[in-house]
Amino acid sequence: MQRVTLTLDDDLLAALDALSARRGYHNRSEAVRDILRDALNQDPPSPESRRGYAVLSYVYEHEKRELASRLVATQHHHHDLSVATLHVHISHDDCLEIAVLKGDMAEVQHFADDVIAQRGVRHGHLQCLADD
């Protein structure tokens, strides 16, 4: 492991300490390592790490003009990426879907973009984890 020195503004250090306390980190280094891992996982994958896992979450209006059918068609079109999907009715009008995906990260990103771009889909978020 390498030792690195960081210079932080007082406000940023206070926010890091508050985050560390909330999450139960034993020291700042653990918190910074996790923050960096999260940031690196959000960065587009490099050519060396083209495969991995991802979680796609989104909310959609299930009665929006054929939206549910379009989403199912998109999922079936990319069936090779799907590991599992969780569907939750969060209100009379809205559903939350969480899809666990595995495969080529460019294809995963394309699938997520197709889903999130659908009219009626809100709060779309893709969390990627490239294979090490």
Swiss-Prot record:
Signal sequence region:
none
Keywords, in A-Z order: DNA-binding, Metal-binding, Nickel, Repressor, Transcription, Transcription regulation
Q: Name one Pfam family in it.
A: NikR_C
Single GO biological process annotation from the record: response to nickel cation
- The UniProt record gives the binding positions of Ni(2+) as H76, H87, H89, C95
Keyword Transcription appears in the UniProt entry: yes
Q: Which cofactor does it need?
A: Ni(2+)
Q: Note the HAMAP family from the entry.
A: NikR (MF_00476)
Q: Which family does it belong to?
A: Belongs to the transcriptional regulatory CopG/NikR family.
Listed NCBIfam families: nikR, PRK02967.1, PRK04460.1
Role noted for this protein: Transcriptional repressor of the nikABCDE operon. Is active in the presence of excessive concentrations of intracellular nickel.
Matching PANTHER family? NICKEL-RESPONSIVE REGULATOR
Name of the protein in question: Nickel-responsive regulator
Which species does this protein come from?
A: Klebsiella pneumoniae subsp. pneumoniae (strain ATCC 700721 / MGH 78578)
